[in-house]
Amino acid sequence: MSADGDHGFTFGYMTLRGEDGSVRLAKYLTYWLRTPQGWRAAAYKRMGRPEGEVSLALMPPSLPAQRLAPNDDSSVVAGHRRTLIAAEQAFSDEAQRIGIGPAFRRNGRDDAVNGGGEAGFTIGAEAISRAVGDGSATSPVSWGADDALVASSGDLGITFGVIRPNGPPPEGRPAAFAFFTIWRRESPDEPWRYVAE
């Protein structure tokens, strides 16, 4: 939840049952905006998940230290948006310099979640960095944000962009694919860190 109470995100597990009796396991991540009509999904991602045990225990909520009134100054929100788009680009640039695993370690939060390829979510920047490429001195991909939404309080936001391989894609893989990343910071004076993807 953002400090202004107007942005939030959820993630979890689902079981999809087809009319033919088939069962598919999945994970989801949703970014929400509060509107006069209620909460509405601004971004939604459903990922398949393999069989396996998953913890259904609730994580502590990712909440701001204090509640703030929404800020109606569009120039302030535009400034927050610019810093968030720049943070996403800096994350990719750092991955090119130090490797994708170390960049995920440096740019994430201890309470970050990643959908990944396991049955459950990977929790924490350290574990996520190991899952995506620990020890790798390079990055197989580069990316950047084309757009972003940011709470008026400047502490929660989401970036949207495209990931591209740094070389020819493996046979049968797309040359580029869309992504979104959810970011949090304690205050507008602090650096952005990814919290969910």
Task: Please annotate each region the language model reported.
Residues 42, 50-106:
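Short, low-complexity N-terminal intrinsically disordered segments enriched in polar/charged residues
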Residues 1-7, 33-38, 150-157, 184-190:
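A short, structured loop/turn motif at beta-sheet edges
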Residues 1-3, 43-65, 115, 139-154, ...:
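Glycine-rich beta-strand-turn "strand-cap" elements at beta-sheet edges
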Residues 34, 89-97, 109, 113, ...:
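Sec-exported extracytoplasmic/periplasmic mature domains
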Residues 12-14, 30, 45-46, 108, ...:
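A mature extracytoplasmic/lumenal domain signature
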Residues 25-62, 176-197:
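Short beta-strand edge/turn micro-motifs at domain boundaries
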Residues 1, 13-16, 27-33, 145-150, ...:
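Hydrophobic/aromatic beta-strand elements that line small-molecule binding cavities or substrate pockets
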Residues 1-6, 21, 101-153, 170-174:
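A solvent-exposed, acidic/Ser-Thr-rich amphipathic alpha-helical stretch
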